[in-house]
Curated annotation (Swiss-Prot):
The lineage of its organism: Bacteria, Bacillati, Bacillota, Bacilli, Bacillales. GO terms for molecular function: hydrolase activity. It comes from Bacillus mycoides (strain KBAB4). SMART domains: Lactamase_B. Keywords: Hydrolase. This is UPF0173 metal-dependent hydrolase BcerKBAB4_4442.
Amino acid sequence: MMRVSYHGHSVVKIETNGKVILIDPFLTGNPKTDLKAEDVKVDAIILSHGHGDHVGDTVALAKNNNAVVVAPFELATFLGWQGVNTHPMHIGGSHEFDFGKVKFTQAFHGSSYIDEENKTITYTGMPAGILFTAEEKTVYHAGDTALFSDMKLIGELNNIDVAFLPIGDNFTMGPEDAVLAAKWIEAKTVVPMHYNTFPVIEQDPYQFVEKLQNCTGKVLEAGESITL
């Protein structure tokens, strides 16, 4: 039995086969999360891209828990230089871990580490979506992305049980595009994410799920979960 929980912004926790996996663990400074970094126990971290609101507390969590960080190659290299145990991957590649199978898909966005103090931007590779499969169940975390037509292909090739889609607009697709994305990927359940963390991405998630067709839409508050 797999338990999938949402923890605000784009933070998703998966519990399966006695393992805990965190996706995009932006905890410190996240006004929408219920988690505190110092309390989190995790076996693996999966990152969609290098922006601060997704990498978040990765370095501290990985070191404190001796957790592996699965990330696009350049981002994994960047984090490895900081003493983190990483497993680099790239778009289209998949790997079987002891906690489940991870495959990276396309995402249309950016990926960089921004050092505000020194006013520098470090390239951290291509952004990715994440397909996670364990116990014959598949979770799709779209990462930060625009709508793109190959979402149809993702839906054709994968039997997706639950999909987390960004709806905040401005930096990612907004609700209207996310409704079309949900139609294309054909997930059984769709959960909105990446909204209401900052004023510029304020959205009504309940209006979004009401517009969904041919799938179940579910708004998860921070800490709520779905059992697959």
